[in-house]
A protein has these predicted regions:
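A short, well-ordered alpha-helix in the C-terminal region of glycosyltransferases
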Residues: 215, 222-237, 243-249
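Conserved catalytic-core segment of nucleotide-activated headgroup transferases in glycan assembly
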Residues: 69-77, 82-150
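Conserved acidic donor-binding segment of nucleotide-sugar-dependent glycosyltransferases
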Residues: 196-207, 215-221
Length: 255
């Protein structure tokens, strides 16, 4: 049996990533991907949009959306949700997603004039943001948990395009696993993960970002409410223990 598990949005090229070399392009050739989708006995996708696309290609119409998952035994909250120290707003990502963070530069500079906070950027690149208390941390697997546990508010800015429409929303799930109140752009798969003002905060405009971050910085009780609910949703829906059962159902069906 051939089971094809697709994590990335293979429908579209990421317009924000740097160019790759010819070998990588060959290995990722769209023709090979389409062939595998078509021939697979079952296709597993990481977003509803991606799943709908694969159904039109797979000859057996045997496709299912299974969300990205996190290790909730390792991704453990450590936040006490108080303001006894400067609140840390955190973002994590790679250089290819840096543009999304860049879109918040003006918001963060303006926010710093009315709120006392630190911005923690965890990634694989250097970053500068004059006018903001900034901490840049190089991402490592060994320190990932510790670095994310040091955040009070997770931010997940995106833009509305075809690439984002097929993304899984894993970054939001990661923040939520740590019990972090997460502010995210209301596009793509994010609204199916974050329920506005129940376990996170969905925004559209720069004004929305300003208001949400200002409220969360100044209201520890709201951070706690959203953060605890976020952790609960991840445990019930996105934990590796929950997701592995969905994979087992598919494997057993193919026997």
């Amino acid at each position: 049996y051939l089971i094809y598990d697709i994590e990335d949005n293979i429908m579209h090229k990421n317009p924000h990533s740097p160019g790759t070399n010819s070998i990588v392009n060959y290995l990722r050739g769209s023709g090979k991907i389409l062939y595998l989708i078509k021939q697979a006995d079952h296709v597993i996708t990481s977003s509803p949009v991606l799943n709908n696309y694969c159904i039109t290609v797979n000859q057996k119409k045997s496709c299912i959306y299974i969300s990205s998952s996190v290790d909730t035994d390792n991704f453990i909250p450590s936040n006490n949700y108080n303001n006894d120290k400067k609140v840390v707003i955190g973002w994590t990502g790679t250089f290819s997603s840096k543009e999304y963070l860049d879109n918040l530069r003006d918001v963060l500079v303006k926010l710093n004039r009315i709120c006392d906070f630190k911005l923690r950027v965890i990634g694989d690149f250097d970053y500068e943001l004059p006018g903001v208390d900034l901490e840049v941390i190089r991402w490592t697997r060994e320190n990932e948990v510790k670095d994310l546990q040091g955040i009070d508010i997770g931010i997940y800015p995106l833009i509305e395009d075809e690439w984002v429409s097929g993304k899984s929303g894993l970054k939001a799930i990661q923040y939520m696993a740590f019990g972090l109140p997460t502010v995210a752009t209301n596009v793509g798969n994010t609204p199916s993960i974050i329920e506005h003002m129940e376990n996170g905060w969905l925004v559209k405009s720069n004004e929305d970002w300003m208001y949400a971050l200002d409220r969360l910085i100044k209201t520890p009780a709201l951070r706690k409410k959203l953060g605890i609910s976020a952790r609960k949703k991840v445990l019930e829906n996105y934990s590796k223990h929950v997701i592995q059962d969905q994979y087992l159902l598919i494997l057993n069906r193919l026997e």
